[in-house]
A protein has these predicted regions:
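Aromatic pocket-lining residues of Rossmann-like dinucleotide-binding sites
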Residues: 76-80
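Short, surface-exposed alpha-helical segments at coil->helix boundaries
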Residues: 15-22, 44, 157-162
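Short, surface-exposed "cap/lid" segments of acyl-processing enzymes
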Residues: 1-39
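Gly/Ala-rich beta-loop-alpha elbow adjacent to hydrolase catalytic centers
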Residues: 64-73
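Catalytic nucleophile-loop/oxyanion-hole region of alpha/beta-hydrolase
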Residues: 32-57
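Short coil/turn segments at beta-strand junctions that form active-site/ligand-binding loops
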Residues: 2-3, 58-60, 83, 143-144
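The alpha/beta-hydrolase serine catalytic core
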Residues: 81-205
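Short beta-strand immediately N-terminal to the catalytic nucleophile in serine-hydrolase-like folds
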Residues: 60-65, 88
Length: 205
């Protein structure tokens, strides 16, 4: 049986990160999606193109996605044949995240609707078009999913994670002293261990 993993990186990440996960995913080919825009209506075409290319060549397709990459994956591939997904610090509710950012920026939806875009002090540009797109394109996600979450994640709330877990076929692993971006030696070792276990369970199904 031929198996492949599609890897979708997060903001500021790289498709080359897929290489560092190969050691955790023995028996799988792995391909990273090289994208640089962060608008779902653009990224979806790149993700769909890669999926379409590998669909006929592999018996099973798995996903690994990081942060906003999880949102892009769910939006694009929700109706596709995915055996299992592994999400790292995932954006699971994009509308909730945008509304949180609106609050953090001390502006209102009305302000955003009138201005179209609002830059923030924390480096993100709020977009009314983006918020409308998210609301007009709800996601139905039925893929078995493993989630790795950090207790000190300053972007995604535990409440959002727990809500997703309760409404989906998903399992949660938490590194309590981890951060949204897993980057220290300790955090990366935890991530590697989690991924190896999740892949082993997956591949035995």
């Amino acid at each position: 049986m031929k198996r492949i993993i599609i890897y979708i990186h997060g903001k500021g990440g790289s498709y080359l990160e897929a290489e560092q996960y190969k050691k955790n995913c023995l028996g799988f080919d792995i391909i990273g999606i090289d994208y640089h825009d962060y608008f779902p209506w653009i990224v979806q075409n790149q993700i769909q193109s890669v999926y379409d290319k590998v669909r006929g060549r592999y018996d099973c397709i798995y996903l690994i996605a990081n942060s906003i990459g999880a949102y892009f994956a769910m939006h694009t591939l929700q109706d596709c044949d995915i055996a299992k997904a592994l999400f790292i610090s995932p954006v699971l509710d994009m509308e909730r995240l945008i509304l949180d950012m609106i609050s953090w920026a001390n502006v209102s939806e009305k302000d955003l609707r009138e201005k179209g875009e609002i830059p923030t002090d924390f480096g993100e540009t709020l977009s009314w078009k983006y918020l409308c797109f998210v609301r007009e394109n709800p996601i139905t996600w039925n893929v078995p999913t493993e989630i790795l979450y950090a207790g000190n994640d300053n972007l995604i709330s535990r409440q959002t994670i727990n809500k997703f877990i309760s409404n989906h076929n998903a399992n949660l692993t938490v590194m309590e002293n981890g951060e949204h971006w897993f980057h220290t030696d300790e955090q990366l070792a935890f991530l590697d261990s989690w991924m190896k276990k999740a892949i082993t369970v997956t591949s035995s199904l």
